[in-house]
Design a protein with these regions (language model features):
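Positively charged n-region of N-terminal signal peptides that target proteins for export
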Residues: 1-4, 20
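Sec-dependent N-terminal signal peptides
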Residues: 4-14
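Short glycine/proline- and aromatic-enriched beta-strand/turn motifs that initiate or cap beta-hairpins
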Residues: 19-60, 180, 184-193
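Feature marks short, surface-exposed loop/turn motifs that line or immediately flank catalytic pockets
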Residues: 35-37, 76, 108-112, 151-155
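Outer-membrane beta-barrel translocator domains and adjoining extracellular loop/strand segments
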Residues: 39-47, 80-85, 113-121, 157-164
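Gram-negative (and chloroplast) outer-membrane scaffold detector with strong preference
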Residues: 55-118, 126-135, 140-142, 178-193
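Outer-membrane beta-barrel proteins, especially TonB-dependent receptors
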Residues: 157-184
Length: 193
């Protein structure tokens, strides 16, 4: 009975929290951990790899449920690194502090480290170009927990003239969109008008 009373009190407390106000700025600090699919530099089409990302997002609350802004993430993979800069829109379903949300991002990923093929061919790879994410999750007070999907553009470069130039010359060969799934935790700092 005592646990039931505590649970009921907790639910009443969460339900009585005030909604966020229109006109606020929200600074979000986030960390992602996920799995990247289909990276060809390992020589297997269905290879998967772990990836992590951290970064800030700055949003403006334009209504009780909608926030828009910009952000950047530092994404690290064991073979390469990249920095996406993106526009962000977050829509919350409800006006309570505890509510589900959907978030959409689109932007450009800048390569920070290239990866050499591990299957013996002389090609190099980078994540560079188109970047997008869709995140579905739940906000509890200042914290967001979510699961997301991501599409990034992977560029492949072939090594030309390795006998003439030391290390050869990299020549762009083609683009491929690569998917990923990830879990995200974020903490939101709210600033008044």
């Amino acid at each position: 009975m005592r646990k039931l009373t505590l649970l009921f009190g907790l639910l009443l407390t969460l339900g009585s929290l005030h909604a966020q106000e229109k006109g606020q700025f929200v600074l979000q600090a986030e960390a992602n951990a996920g799995i990247l699919f289909c990276y060809p530099y390992q020589g297997a089409f269905n290879s998967i790899d772990l990836e992590g990302a951290v970064g800030p997002v700055l949003r403006y609350q334009v209504g009780d449920r909608l926030e828009i802004g910009i952000g950047a993430n530092y994404c690290a993979h064991h073979a390469f690194q990249y920095l996406p800069i993106f526009a962000d829109a977050k829509y919350c379903f409800g006006i309570e502090k505890s509510r589900p949300y959907a978030e959409l991002r689109a932007g450009y990923a800048f390569p920070l480290k290239y990866a050499k093929s591990e299957n013996g061919n002389p090609n190099w790879y980078s994540v560079e170009g188109f970047f997008s994410q869709l995140i579905l999750g739940y906000s509890i007070s200042h914290s967001d927990i979510g699961i997301g999907g991501q599409l990034v553009n992977m560029k492949e470069y072939s090594t030309e003239w390795p006998d003439i130039l030391p290390g050869g010359c990299l020549t762009f060969t083609h683009n491929q969109l690569k998917p990923a799934v990830f879990l995200r935790y974020a903490y939101n700092f709210h600033f008044g008008k």
